[in-house]
Amino acid sequence: SLTKVIVTTSSIMKLIEMGKINLYDYLKEYFPELPAKKEEITIYHLLTHSSGFQAIVKLWDKDLDYQQKIKYILDLPLENEIGEVVNYSDPNFILLGELVQRVSGQNLNQFSQDQIFKPLNMQNTAYKPLANLEEISKNKIAAAEYCSFRDRMIVGEVHDENCYALGEISGHAGLFSNLNDLSKFVRMLLNKGTYNDKKILSKLTVKTMTKNWTENLKQNRALGWDLINNFRSSGGILFSDKAFGHTGFTGTSIWIDPGSELGVIFLTNRVHPSRDNVDIISLRPRLHNLIAAVLN
């Protein structure tokens, strides 16, 4: 799920900077097939997980083509009133990924490569790494777990079942990277949008993206990003109140604290050999507290 912030949120903010979209545009403008009862949903609602969509949807067992799967999501009944509840939701970011493609004319891998990864010289970051990265082989990629419907151990292909069912490129999951590349991305955000004289986002965009957009709701969210001032935050309790971050299901996380000019990238394959190990939930905040205390 680091894909949600590294690729999708960054891409949406780039499109906003380009004047292609606006945060408060109605989803209906880009998805005319959206049912009328959902016409009040905006890009803002998707980015802050306040659209009302459910947390998870099963697409991998549906005999549908790609666009039919998008329509299936659009037709899902809402679990909450629009704008009333923050409920972390994969469907939100699947739709945002499709929105990037409809507006830019490029799929997420192409758009993020052109706008983010190539300018940052992130040479080991891509969707579908075995097909899209030179000199990358399976023995250089951490294994995930055995997948029953694929009938194989997952190595070098996306772990997330829905992303796999969507062609391995989606807004909610699927990105592969490494520590060196992600450190460039984190430094770019710590430096307010610029790294090695390459401006990826404007200072104002980074500031706007990482502020609290859901103060009136029970959970604090930035645009795409999680915020530190939430109950039982994975970022712990010692980062400054400016900190923002995100986690990934397979055992990854990024936390960035502009207040102390600190970024923490934590990459594991905790789902190998099985997703049953959930100790990382308690480990993450303890790790971040330790790092914050030592370095401050």
Residue map of PLM features:
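Short loop/turn motifs at secondary-structure junctions and domain boundaries
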Residues: 245-248
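Active-site SXXK
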Residues: 1-24, 93-101, 182-185, 261
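Surface-exposed amphipathic alpha-helical segments
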Residues: 280-296
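Short, surface-exposed loop or secondary-structure junction motifs
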Residues: 37-242
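A short acidic/small-residue loop/turn micro-motif
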Residues: 270-273
